[in-house]
Amino acid sequence: MAQGTVIRITDELFLSLLNKLEYFVEPLENYEEGGLHHTDLILRLREAVWVHRKISQVLWFPFLRRHADVITSSESKYITYTNFILYNSVNYLLDPYDRLIATCSIIIAVAELSYERGKQVFSDCSSKIFQVFFEEFLKTPFEKRGGWQYLEEYILKQRYLKWYNKKEICPNFYKTEEHLQQELKLAEYIHQMACNDFKVDFLPIKSNENEVENNEEISRLTDKVVKGLLLDP
């Protein structure tokens, strides 16, 4: 698969998703999607990622809330923490298509956090984070699975797509502290249930800053993203 294809698809995908987040920065009575001229594949992938961003971050919600200030303190920290979450979640999924959708979804979930904190400028590196992670971990199994050719067909089989237009999954950038605490308690409950089911510490969501920022593999990925951003025109 040509690298240019990956760049073109993901640049368009993330630009579209970030524009969608932008609509919710100011309260709206109604949200209408207009002026979209994407290919069917990007439209379907966009729908899947928009819904799945709520699924993929559930177990990581306590981690995101605990480290929100650090994550949105600089572009480097934003990239580092996003890579940490990706590395410690996506690679556990078996289906390459699930991995790709989860990767996009986690990146958008972190972008949503940056919008909530008024630091949406960091979300501009979303597509570059994906492209580096794709080349490192997703590309070979994704191509063996059928690549972009069969991805749309796979997405259309996912039952969670019915949630795409539901207001329940729209961003809420005006949460009260009480609302945030309720979300946190629910996420911690779900995480504990997952730990009990799998009989292991399901994900390293209790990792501290040193464990994240001093991880050599994560630092390597972050360096590649930063260098890629510097090379972009």
Model-derived features: where do they sit?
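Core of folded catalytic or high-affinity ligand/protein-binding domains
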Residues: 61-148
